[in-house]
């Protein structure tokens, strides 16, 4: 059993839900990314999603697009991200998932990427532009190395798509609570609760909900039906206003409040 499975099993045993925090790797630099992973865990994060910056991020709203641009301008590359994960693995066993697009992995070489990622201590990969129908080769290589491949479900996913994701996915299922791009929203869409309940009846993997969750109250309401909650844009927006110690303090405070909201 890997770190992702262990984390969800431990949380379920204690009747708790997961807080998954997303930050862009390399924004503002990879040294900050490494120290933030430790801070986020201390503040209450159960899993870390690291965004792999990409020049054409079609699924990302303006907040994460700008964050990707800052990371790329700072010289962030996939090999450097893997080196950062390898370094932080000396300090923590928190599950780390890389989230991004297929192109950087294709350019790195799929087999080489999977080997390098597992060696660095990456636990899973979520590629927003690699649907299950096209993921066969990547999934087979990842399975051999024990790298979880996480797929998305959306409000428009039909029964066939749910079945495919349930069959092919590992780690957890990421339910996108809204159609469109990433970004914090002021309220939770009504369909989320019934959709998540429907999905959970059909799958054995944990179901986490992301896109648009921005405050403890929203996180708490989502956690009432899901196995975990992902918060990204609300955290990443802080990188536009804060840096250094102020950034660490701001994110830690937000994550502590989100964790309390989930536990409420």
Swiss-Prot record:
Q: Which UniProt keywords apply?
A: Amino-acid biosynthesis, Aromatic amino acid biosynthesis, Lyase, Tryptophan biosynthesis
EC number annotated for this UniProt entry:
4.2.1.20
Q: Which GO terms describe its molecular function?
A: tryptophan synthase activity
Database matches in CDD domains: Tryptophan_synthase_alpha (cd04724)
Could you confirm whether the keyword RNA-binding appears in this record? no
Summary of subunit composition and partner proteins? Tetramer of two alpha and two beta chains.
The function of this protein is: The alpha subunit is responsible for the aldol cleavage of indoleglycerol phosphate to indole and glyceraldehyde 3-phosphate.
Family according to the record: Belongs to the TrpA family.
Protein name (database record): Tryptophan synthase alpha chain
Give the source species: Geotalea daltonii (strain DSM 22248 / JCM 15807 / FRC-32) (Geobacter daltonii)
